[in-house]
A protein has these predicted regions:
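Cytosolic covalent-transfer regions centered on His/Cys nucleophiles
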Residues: 2-173
Length: 173
């Protein structure tokens, strides 16, 4: 079954069964953030995507500004130690994202006032509102699980985090 969205046909099955591993860039995962404040976290995560050639150097500052502008609308620190900074930007050719972890936690102005330890950054093309929302919904679904959050915080390095992502996506490792 096809569904029209912004003039593009999207397979309904693809729309509804999005996996984290469909858009998380494994090589850009940060197992221990150096950043200690909101803007620095966003910058470090965007630079991780740049470092693996998912964002052009010339777009980095504009992407950071776009993410910070989104934060001004309301914090993406959703609580329980998780934040999901996200935006749409014309530099993105497809939905991409990364994950970062902070052992010490970062004040991200989260809704529950707690420090954030897990960050899921999402960057989507401007014309992909439906898929952007589907990716946010997928992230939202998995981060509701206390075990998932704990396992991601305790995972042994990048390989451990990737293994957990694949497991939650139903990919046998």
């Amino acid at each position: 079954m096809d569904r029209k969205h912004n003039g593009k046909a999207i397979l309904l099955e693809e729309f509804c069964s999005m996996k984290l591993t469909d858009f998380i860039v494994e090589d850009a995962i940060i197992t221990e953030l150096k950043a200690t404040d909101k803007e620095s976290v966003i910058k470090e995560m965007v630079c991780a995507l740049k470092d693996v050639q998912k964002i052009n150097s010339k777009d980095v500052e504009n992407v950071i500004k776009s993410l910070m502008k989104r934060e001004e609308l309301g914090s993406t620190g959703i609580g329980k130690g998780v934040a999901v900074p996200h935006t749409k930007h014309d530099c993105a050719k497809k939905i991409i994202g990364t994950i970062a972890r902070s052992t010490q936690g970062v004040d991200f102005n989260a809704l529950d006032g707690e420090s954030v330890h897990l960050f899921f950054l999402l960057l989507s093309p401007n014309d992909s509102a439906g898929l952007h929302l589907a990716a946010l919904e997928r992230i939202s679904t998995v981060i509701r699980d206390n075990d998932f959050r704990r396992f991601m915080r305790e995972a042994n390095g990048k390989a451990g985090m990737i293994e957990i992502l694949k497991e939650v996506d139903g990919i046998h490792v």
